[in-house]
Regions:
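Extracytoplasmic and endomembrane cell-envelope/extracellular-matrix remodeling and assembly machinery
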Residues: 1-192
Length: 192
């Protein structure tokens, strides 16, 4: 019998209880797994079911406990997607110290800044995300729509994106960009 055989059996019982609704029996089993290394997996699964009411402080606390495991970033992504879907922008921003790495979440990040009053930073982020040689994630569409309605890209930014599209051999994007360009730039885009 190895050191963890009893805990392994309890862990399997805890997983079964989680699947069936995580009642009092689950809490008792989980408490018995205080030193079991995979207990954090149980906490992760439980937290996924609590995302709607989870506060930024609770999310940060779990991520601190799960630091060094993939579960910290997995909870962060799930939390951010959930808060973005619910448009709970202050809660979204409450777990971030910097813009996220994933483009989808960056788009939500700048939407959150826009919704909480930081229009300048939001539109700066929109311009940066827009200036690529390919179509961006659909999550960016609401941000781009607000940016376009407010100021949108100038011809220099349109030209920059067109050159990136040209390098990526994305003629469809170049044709799309023409609708935003001034008359002189439209002629230049025809030459690409």
């Amino acid at each position: 019998i190895d050191q963890w055989s009893e805990e392994r059996a309890l862990y399997q019982d805890a997983l079964a209880e989680l699947d069936s609704g995580a009642g009092n029996r689950y809490r008792d089993i989980r408490a018995a797994l205080a030193s079991y290394p995979l207990r954090i997996d149980l906490d992760f699964s439980t937290n996924l079911g609590l995302l709607h009411d989870m506060t930024p402080a609770e999310a940060r606390a779990f991520m601190a406990r799960a630091q060094g495991t993939p579960l910290a970033s997995r909870l962060m992504v799930a939390y951010l997607r959930h808060k973005a879907q619910d448009r709970r922008w202050r809660a979204f921003l409450g777990v971030l110290d910097a813009p996220p790495a994933m483009v989808e979440l960056q788009c939500h990040y700048y939407r959150a800044l826009l919704a909480t009053g930081d229009q300048a930073m939001a539109f700066e982020g929109a311009a940066s995300l827009w200036n690529v040689g390919f179509s961006q994630d659909d999550a960016c569409d609401p941000l781009f729509a607000r940016w376009m309605a407010n100021s949108g890209p100038d011809d220099a930014l349109i030209w920059s994106r067109a050159l990136k599209a040209f390098q990526a051999k994305n003629g469809r994007l170049i044709r799309y960009l023409k609708r935003f360009a001034g008359e002189a730039l439209q002629r230049d885009l025809d030459e690409l």
